[in-house]
Regions:
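Cytosolic nucleotide-utilizing catalytic cores of signal-transduction proteins
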Residues: 1-187
Length: 189
């Protein structure tokens, strides 16, 4: 990977992060071109399509930039594609890596952030791997363990059988990142 990077004049020891942009329709090329229009002109950032619905941006992260700036960058992508391309998108990003060989890890983290975000944070358009919280832990649990837990807790009952107050409490629990203190506060009121 280092030899290939050298041939292509790509710095190997630069801070980078991977963004995944997922559209909810088959690409007509418009979304990819819009993102390339913003980031592709910079020789330090790379934009490519992975499949019909996913675009990847490997962005250089300057010294002093952190996750707040990356969240703003992701929001710019969402806003631009929502207004100009008139398509709803979700953007997820991994952690900042320091070497080119770690870019694949940032991609895997961004992919997991996208998957976990769809399950635990469906209303969010921007999902950061570093801010997944306990949703990431739950997502990584083995399926048999989850099924066993659900069977023990719900004892054969369907979530459709719960009253509205219980469902609201469960939703608030998830909205507060499964924070037990917030949950206790909700139950007190």
């Amino acid at each position: 990977i280092y030899n290939r990077a050298k041939k292509l004049h790509i710095d190997t020891e630069v801070r980078r992060v991977v963004f995944i942009v997922e559209t909810n329709r088959e690409k007509d090329g418009n979304e990819l071109e819009k993102i390339r229009g913003i980031f592709g002109g910079k020789s330090k950032d790379f934009v490519t399509a992975v499949d019909e619905k996913n675009i990847i941006l490997v962005k250089e992260v300057k010294n002093g930039e952190g996750y707040d700036e990356l969240t703003k960058t992701a929001q710019v992508i969402v806003d631009m594609l929502n207004t100009e391309a008139m398509t709803k998108v979700h953007v997820a990003f991994g952690t900042i890596v320091n070497e080119i060989k770690e870019v694949s890890r940032s991609y895997k983290e961004a992919k997991m952030a996208m998957d976990v975000g769809k399950i635990f944070y469906p209303d969010k358009n921007v999902i950061a791997y570093s801010r997944l919280g306990i949703g990431r832990l739950i997502y990584q649990l083995p399926l048999p363990l989850c099924k066993m837990f659900i069977k023990e807790i719900f004892d054969g009952r369907s979530p459709d059988e719960f009253d509205e107050e219980t469902l609201q409490t469960i939703n608030k629990f998830f909205e507060n990142n499964l924070n037990a203190v917030s949950y206790t506060h909700l139950r007190a009121h």
